Amino acid sequence: MAYSKLGRTSSQRKALLRDLATDLIINERIQTTEQKAKELRPVVEKLITLGKRGDLHARRQVASFVRREAAGQNEAGKTQDAIQKLFADVAPRFAERQGGYTRIMKMGPRRGDGAEMVIIELV
């Protein structure tokens, strides 16, 4: 399977994708470079598919990848983390959709180094 190294070692790349995936689940839209977004898309798609499954094994698989960060409050006023948000809010939204949960929109080049910037968001 082809992938981009993103100028990092494998552990740094995995940490970067974990952070970006967690941020995308929490904020539902982030701005990043085009290459990072293209690498992030299949990771997030798999996480949402696990969220749709919703069983204990899927929860544990997601918990092993997504960071435990606060994702705001739910309807009851309790603080929820990124994993709870994925299973309670994000995955049910895509119950009828078979893949294609993310959208990448180009923003133009970054001012400092000219890297192509994009917004990746949940549909």
Curated annotation (Swiss-Prot):
Keywords: Ribonucleoprotein, Ribosomal protein. GO terms for cellular component: cytosolic large ribosomal subunit. PROSITE patterns: RIBOSOMAL_L17. GO terms for molecular function: structural constituent of ribosome. Signal peptide: none annotated. SUPFAM superfamilies: Prokaryotic ribosomal protein L17. Pfam families: Ribosomal_L17. Gene3D superfamilies: Ribosomal protein L17 (3.90.1030.10). Belongs to the bacterial ribosomal protein bL17 family. NCBIfam families: L17 (TIGR00059). PANTHER family: LARGE RIBOSOMAL SUBUNIT PROTEIN BL17M, RIBOSOMAL PROTEIN L17. This is Large ribosomal subunit protein bL17. The lineage of its organism: Bacteria, Bacillati, Bacillota, Bacilli, Bacillales.
